[in-house]
Amino acid sequence: MAVAPAGGQHAPALEALLGAGALRLLDSSQIVIISTAPDVGAPQLPAAPPTGPRDSDVLLFATPQAPRPAPSAPRPALGRPPVKRRLDLETDHQYLAGSSGPFRGRGRHPGKGVKSPGEKSRYETSLNLTTKRFLELLSRSADGVVDLNWAAEVLKVQKRRIYDITNVLEGIQLIAKKSKNHIQWLGSHTMVGIGKRLEGLTQDLQQLQESEQQLDHLMHICTTQLQLLSEDSDTQRLAYVTCQDLRSIADPAEQMVIVIKAPPETQLQAVDSSETFQISLKSKQGPIDVFLCPEESADGISPGKTSCQETSSGEDRTADSGPAGPPPSPPSTSPALDPSQSLLGLEQEAVLPRMGHLRVPMEEDQLSPLVAADSLLEHVKEDFSGLLPGEFISLSPPHEALDYHFGLEEGEGIRDLFDCDFGDLTPLDF
């Protein structure tokens, strides 16, 4: 008889039963013990002896087991890993207690994209937007020092979000910690808030461009109107200025009028000191002519300045039928000229009747356009020689004296170049 070693720890007990003669076995019989894993806490009970002998060659014995307690809860299936949950970093605690329904499959939850009205969007709570708002707070600080507690209250975010930003800025040496909750900006203040300043400058530049375009349009209109005025045949006959017209603007008793006829691109420089007033003229295009406008005489007046009352007074100014001679001078009792009256804005009807009585030849082919200003004064002197008792006094020396520019000493002025007596003239008061 042999005992199989499959019994393990029950083999000594079986040998004791066989030695006591409790079991009647033949010599060729085999005993096989089938048992499960041992339970430490369960008591071991001896097997009941058989009631009678059996003729089977193999005897089977079962190891008694203690009753197991019922499981408290079903265990989850081991074939699928546990579900990973996304953390809500905006709350004070990490996990929220709440019941969740059974998760079936990998389909999208129907209520996942629906947000409550008071819930912030993902962009509003992003670190990118929080960093921009934090830099705006730094730009408002005069010395660049910001309290982190105050910044968290203003931005309405958690302090750990502010700490994340300050740790990065401190790592790239843009800020430095002054104390536990105070930091100071180390970078350039011009870079903080540069986006808004750039936007404001762009708007200012656009407004300046619009203003420039408007001014260019107005200048173009004025240039066009002036060109049309100069090309009009009706206005060409009145395109001149006399000495009396200039005197009507300035007070002859207080001011001295000097007329300057210069070519284009003439440079004028005026030096105003406490005692003297100096004017410097320089031109590379041609000579510069300077004239002195004398005081207006009592019997001389410009035909364009004839008073309307004098025209409508009813006096007979019909000339003789003989050859045209020099017209008589206007009476000395003519009314004074109005300084506020425009020089060139005269009515044509008020001038032409006056010109008809003078019997002065006024052919249009003899008139020069406005642009030909060199010969305009000569035409005026020839046509109105009887009405101009005093002409412009030329202050320019003869053109053959080319060295007059270098013939003045430091104490000499423009009056030293001419043989005119300027003692009776009153200096200009500016």
From Swiss-Prot:
Family that this chain belongs to: Belongs to the E2F/DP family.
Keywords, alphabetical: Acetylation, Activator, Apoptosis, Cell cycle, DNA-binding, Methylation, Nucleus, Phosphoprotein, Transcription, Transcription regulation, Ubl conjugation
Protein's name according to its UniProt entry: Transcription factor E2F1
Region ranges (Transactivation): 361-430
Residue numbers of Phosphoserine PTMs: 368, 396
Native species: Mus musculus
DNA-binding region listed in the record: 105-189
Its job: Transcription activator that binds DNA cooperatively with DP proteins through the E2 recognition site, 5'-TTTC[CG]CGC-3' found in the promoter region of a number of genes whose products are involved in cell cycle regulation or in DNA replication. The DRTF1/E2F complex functions in the control of cell-cycle progression from G1 to S phase. E2F1 binds preferentially RB1 in a cell-cycle dependent manner. It can mediate both cell proliferation and TP53/p53-dependent apoptosis. Blocks adipocyte differentiation by binding to specific promoters repressing CEBPA binding to its target gene promoters.
